[in-house]
Amino acid sequence: MQITRRQWLQATGAFAAALAIGPRIARAAELKTVRFGIGQKAMAPNVINCVIGEVLGYNKEENFTVKPQALGGNSNVQVAVERGDVDIGIGVPSFGLPLLAKGEWGSAINYYEYTYPYKWDIVVKPGSTIKSYADLKGKKIGVSDFAGTEYPVTRNVLKSLQIDPDKDVKWVAVGNGVPAGVALDRGAIDALAYYDTGFGQIEAAGIGMQFLPRPKDLPMVGGQFLMAKKSMLKDNRALLIGFGRSVSKASRFLLADPAAGAKAFLEMYPETAPRGSSTEEAVKAVLVAIGRRIKLYEPPYPNAKMGSINAQEFKTEAELNGLKIPDYSGFFTNELIDTIDNYDVKKIQAQAVAYKR
C-alpha cells in the first residue's frame, strides 16, 4: 500500500506535536537533561542520527537524556547556544562565518560534524525547459525559508557558476516539506532548492520532480555540526563527548540498517507516522526521507574519522562569500574526536542488524 499525499501531510503536521511531547520513553531522574537546539520549526527525520541514541540506549550509557527544541532557524540556535538557553545546538557555517569575519563570533565552538557535504540540490517540474543550473537565470527559485540552509548554500553555488544570486534570480520562500513541493507542482516557482531529506518528504507525498545535474567541481560546503559553548570543553567535557559518541553510534547504526534506524525513530515519535499507516508503511515513509542523507554521515575525505572537521570547508565557503578570515581556530575543534569515536563499531552494526522492535 502506497502512502498518500494526505497521509504524508498528516505525518509532517505531527512532527511539530511530537517534538513538543517528546520521545515516549522513560527518563531516569538521575540522568542529565541535555537541551538540544534544532534550527527548524518542527522535528523531522533529517536529524534522526542526533536523536535516536535516546531509544537505542546510547544516551543512557553516557548519563544523559536529550530534549530536542525546535527553534525555527539556524540563527536562533546560534543565539540560544550563546545565551545558554540550550546546551548543544546544530551549527551551520553559513550563519557563523560572517560573524567570525566581523570579529563578532562569541563563545560557541563547533566540535563534531554530524553530516557532511553535499546535501542540497535544485529540482524542477517534470518536463520543464530548465535543464541545468545555467538555465536558472531570470527564474524564480523556491526555498523553504530564508533562514534555511539551502538558501545561503545555493547562493554560494550560483556564485561559483558566475550567476549573481541577487540580480540573476528571484528567491521565494515556499515553506517546508510537502508545501514546497506543492509550490513547484502548481507553478508558483520555476525551481526548488532544498536538501536531501526535504526532497524525500516531497517524493513520499507523490509529487513529481526532476533533479538538475549538479555542476562539476561543486564546492564542498554546507556541513552541519554539533556546537556548544567553549567553556563546556573544560567544565562539561564528558557531556560533549557523550553526546557526540551517541550521534556517532546512531550514524553507524543507520548505515548498517536504515530500516532499523527508522523503527527506532518511530518508537521515539510514533505520532509522526502517517495516520492509518501500518508499521511497514510508516518505516517506508521515514526511509524515503532519509535515503540520501545517510551516506553523508561518513566523511568524504581519505582516512578521516567520523565526525572530524575539515577546515577547508570553512575556507571555501568564506572565499565564495568574500569573507576575510585569517584564523579559524576559535570556530572549531577536533580535540574530542578520538575519544568520541572510541567504541566498538562492530557491536553497533550487529545491534542494528538484530534490531526487532
Describe the role of every protein-language-model region.
Residues 236-324:
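Secondary-structure end/capping motifs
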